[in-house]
Amino acid sequence: MTDEPLVLGIETSCDETGVGVVRGRTLLANEIASSVDLHARFGGVVPEVASRAHLEALVPTMHRALEKAGLRLADVDAIAVTAGPGLAGTLLVGVAAAKAYALALGKPLFGVNHLAAHVAVDILEHGPLPRPCVALLVSGGHSSLLLVEDVTGTVRPLGSTVDDAAGEAFDKVARVLGLPFPGGPPIDRAAQEGDPQFVAFPRGKADDGTFDFSFAGLKTAVARWVEKRERDGEPVPVADVAAAFQEAVADVLTAKAVAACRTYGVGDLLIGGGVAANSRLRSLAAERCEAAGIRLRVPRPGLCTDNGAMVAALGACLIKAGRTPSEPEFPADSSLPITEVLV
C-alpha cells in the first residue's frame, strides 16, 4: 500500500454519524449527520435514539462523502471505524457496517480508538505529530490528558475526569441557565457579553498535584448559585454566569495541560475534542502556552467535534506505520482504553 493510502473513516460513537475520506494527510471529504435535535428535548443523548439515527443516516452520509471526494467505495484502499470507547449501541452500528463493506469489497479494516483519532486528526491541518506531545482531549464524554509518543501505538494516560466530563458540565449548566442543548456553543456565545470574574466558581482538583479533572462540584456550584438568585427574586445574569463558568473550566484544563508539558519535558500541546471549539479554552491555552514556551496545536472547530475524517486519519497513520489490520471478529468496546489504539 502507498505512503498516502486512500482511507474511508466511519464514526458512530455517540450522536454524530461521521464519514470521512483522506489520502494520507490530505482531507478529501468530511460529512456529518447529527441527531442532536432528536436529543434536545431530553437534555442529553439517548442511546437508543442515537442508534436508530445512525441506522438511518449512515448510508446517505457515506454517499455524500464519496461524492464530495469524487470516488466510488471500491476506490478506497482501506476502511477505518471507531471501535470504542463510546455508547455500545451506537458503536455497533458503525462497526457492523464497516465489517460488511470491508468483507464485500475485500478491503483491510482497522478498528480504532476514538480518543486516539481525536489526536490523529490534527495531521490533516498541521502535518505530522511531534513526538512526543501532550494531548488534552475534552468532550461530552471525556476529559483526558495523554502523553503521546506515537499515535499509532504508544499513548500513555496521564489523567482523566473523576466524575463529569467538561462537555457534560457545559450541557448541565446550559440547562440551568435556560440555554439549549448541547450547551457548549450557547454558553460560549452568551459568555462573550459576560464578565468572567463575576463569580469565583470553584476549580475542582486544581491544586491536588495530579493531572485528573473534576467538574461535578463546579456544575453543582453554578446550579446552587442560580437557585439562590431565583429564590431571592433576583434576575440571573446569564451572560456573566456563563462567562464565569467557562473561565473556571478553561482555567483548570489549560493549567493542568501546561503543567503536564512541563513535568514531562514536552514542548508541544495538542487540544482536541468537541470542547476544543470553545473560544475561551483556545485563547487561554494560547496565552499560557506562549508564556511557557510551548507550541500549541488545535484543529479547526469542524475537526474537533466527532467526525469520520479523524477516524480515516488514524487509519492512514496506522497503514503508514505498517500496522496489521484488525481481525474480522473484533468487537465494539464501549470502554476501550486509550492504550489500545488498534483493536
Swiss-Prot record:
Q: What is its main location?
A: cytoplasm
Q: State what protein this is by name.
A: tRNA N6-adenosine threonylcarbamoyltransferase
**Species per Swiss-Prot/TrEMBL record:** Acidothermus cellulolyticus (strain ATCC 43068 / DSM 8971 / 11B)
Asked if the keyword Endoplasmic reticulum belongs to this entry, the reply reads: no
Q: How is the cofactor bound?
A: Binds 1 Fe(2+) ion per subunit.
Its taxonomic path starts at: Bacteria, Bacillati, Actinomycetota, Actinomycetes, Acidothermales
The prosthetic group or cofactor this protein requires is: Fe(2+)
CDD domains under this entry?
A: ASKHA_NBD_TsaD_bac (cd24133)
Q: What class of enzyme is it?
A: transferase
Entry superkingdom? Bacteria
